[in-house]
Amino acid sequence: NTIVNIVKKIDPERQKLIKGGLPGSEVGGNNPAWSHKAGERPTDLGQGDIYTLVLTELTPDNEVVWEMDLSEALDPELDVITPLTGRSLWPGLNSIDELPDGNLISTSYNLSQVYIWDKETKKVKWRFGQGKDRISFPHDPHGLENGNVILFDNGRFHSADPDGGTNFFPPDFSRVIE
């Protein structure tokens, strides 16, 4: 089977709970990449909509056998969009892999976290990347035979303070974390 991402608009009431990101960068806000034809000047500079991903498992015959709406699994208090990224997608994923136990592991570039998604409960089983363990723009997570996780941390806009606040500094750095 194959897991694909299906884009879906988040319920407007749930959208109000989502924190962080660049104000006005929602779909239909002042984000020209999403909301305006080439060469036209944006006219609507208000807040637009936020979309999510629905992880969808398909058989080789394109039969849907499992779905998980990530916006229902995320916690708006914990899963905050990083300050210098857009608010058009919550979360934005850049990789996903199946673990030996059947659960899924992925990274979110705009939440700067690693997630293990529990396929049975459709909830976040584990997240990494906050506070003193802060990572930034991670990708390519893999579960190892010993149960550990290995991933790549781009280190972009990494926070200078140990509690993971908003003191961002250059230069970017890269590292592999286990």
Question: Across the structure, where does each feature detected by a protein language model lie?
Answer:
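Histidine-/acidic-rich catalytic cores in large beta-rich domains
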Residues: 1-178
